[in-house]
A protein has these predicted regions:
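A residue-identity detector for tryptophan
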Residues: 18, 154, 171, 188-189
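Short, P/G- and charge-enriched loop/turn segments at secondary-structure junctions
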Residues: 23-25, 149, 191
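Glycine-rich beta-alpha loop elements in corrinoid/cobalamin-binding modules
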Residues: 33, 37-167, 171
Length: 192
């Protein structure tokens, strides 16, 4: 996502990348892991809004309006983008004090304690996010405790807790991504 410092932070794309606001070759692809996770959430009956901040060119001020009325933000982060992502999440929490922030990706999976030390991050997902996020959001919506849910890390009473990994997922159980969740204004690369 964008931040106060730069329009685009980092995003892998086909044969290139976005880096600090500059496109370096290639064509963009949809955020497939977020799309897959959003699809699982939608099929579980949750209200889902998927925004590709880079492809939709949503700036920081617009982003504040997007998160004003939502309960949870889920962000895919990497080590390269982690500092800006976590700072952005902290700023967004200032506009929505009840906002819960969840991050997943390689950085939170391999460095869970380090990730949770940042005040902008409430919960991390370790390894594959689809079913862990589904179970987590279901527990949150039901007002139930998620402390024992495998595959997450979280903060409670100023302490960091990292639970065991969620069992490996049979990828045949993950549904085909619902591309209707993507903005119809997006123009993703299609090699076919």
């Amino acid at each position: 996502p964008s931040s106060r410092e730069t329009e685009n932070v980092h995003r892998d794309v086909l044969y290139g990348c976005w880096c600090k606001g500059s496109r370096i070759g290639g064509g963009t692809l949809p955020p497939l892991s977020l799309l897959s996770t959003a699809t699982v959430l939608k099929q579980a009956g949750h209200d889902v809004v998927l925004r590709d901040m880079i492809e939709e060119n949503i700036g920081f001020e617009q982003l504040k309006d997007v998160v004003k009325y939502i309960d949870v933000v889920i962000v895919l982060t990497s080590t390269m983008s982690f500092v800006e992502d976590s700072n952005l999440l902290l700023e967004l929490k200032e506009f929505n004090e009840g906002l819960k922030t969840i991050v997943f990706g390689a950085h939170p999976s391999f460095m869970p304690e380090d990730t949770l030390e940042h005040p902008g991050i409430d919960i991390i997902i370790r390894r594959e996010p689809e079913f862990v996020v589904r179970d987590l959001i279901s527990l949150m919506n039901e007002g139930k405790d998620y402390d024992s849910l495998n595959g997450i890390g979280y903060k409670k009473n100023n302490r960091v807790f990292v639970n065991p990994f969620y069992p490996f997922v049979d990828y045949n159980q993950i549904p085909i991504s619902d591309r209707s969740l993507l903005s119809q204004r997006s123009h993703y690369y299609n090699p076919i």
